[in-house]
Amino acid sequence: MAEVIEHLAISEDHFLETITGKVMKAPPRPKGEDEDVKKIDEFVIANVPDRTSKFKAPEPIAPKNRFGSPEASLKHFLESRERSIAFLKKTEGLRDHALESPFKNKFDAYQWVLFMTAHSERHTKQINEVKADAKFSKA
């Protein structure tokens, strides 16, 4: 479970850096791809949290005990989430720019935010699965 929490903390930073440093600076989505926006939104919301497919974390966001403890990882995640929320509160035009995603579609910044939150939901489900396992030590 500690590795999942660390992965979430690293991922939150990675998503925000991608959105602010790349997506918001990318060109607009090409004409003709606008009709795909709703389909992509729905795809992200339906598929990213789905735990029936398993994936290995890419190397840059793989857990490596960067924070020293699960508590420190959680603290970092919460601080990163606050930065994400602050960015969203002050930023307009999330649909105005699009960048290639891991799914081979271009995601606009709004869709990257959907991806970030759906990714958190996926791993929250994973944590709950671990906690529900009879072998999980509650001590």
Language-model-detected regions and their locations in the chain:
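Short, contiguous alpha-helical
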Residues: 1-43, 89, 93-139
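Acidic/histidine-rich alpha-helical segments that form the ligand environment
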Residues: 40-95
